[in-house]
């Protein structure tokens, strides 16, 4: 979907997970304003605290901003959600999340 579709979704329903996650992820994919991506992805994680991909996207956005100490607990929470069985998937992202945590130091 085009980024404008996600912006419309957020404007119409600011507390909607899909709009917030989609917009934050799309901003990341486009290499745009990572601060804005963090804003939307934080809301997405608050709305669905066991959505593994949202944790991964937020962790990547924080890391891109050099905010490594903020990124690590976000990534660890995503790993915990995936490995505890509380999430509906996302286990395939665990190796990438662990690798990013190691890279962050």
What is the meaning of each model-derived region?
Residues 63, 68-87:
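TPR/TPR-like (Sel1-like) alpha-helical repeat modules
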Residues 12, 46-47, 81, 85:
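Structural marker of alpha-solenoid helical repeat scaffolds
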């Amino acid at each position: 979907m085009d980024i404008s579709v996600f912006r419309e979704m957020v404007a119409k329903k600011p507390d909607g997970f899909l709009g917030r996650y989609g917009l934050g992820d799309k901003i990341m994919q486009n290499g745009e304003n990572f601060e804005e991506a963090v804003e939307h992805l934080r809301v997405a994680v608050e709305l669905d605290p066991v959505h593994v991909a949202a944790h991964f996207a937020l962790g990547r956005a924080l890391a891109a901003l050099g905010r490594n100490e903020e990124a690590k607990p976000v990534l660890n929470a995503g790993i915990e959600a995936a490995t505890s069985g509380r999430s509906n998937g996302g286990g395939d992202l665990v190796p990438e999340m662990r690798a990013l945590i190691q890279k962050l130091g």
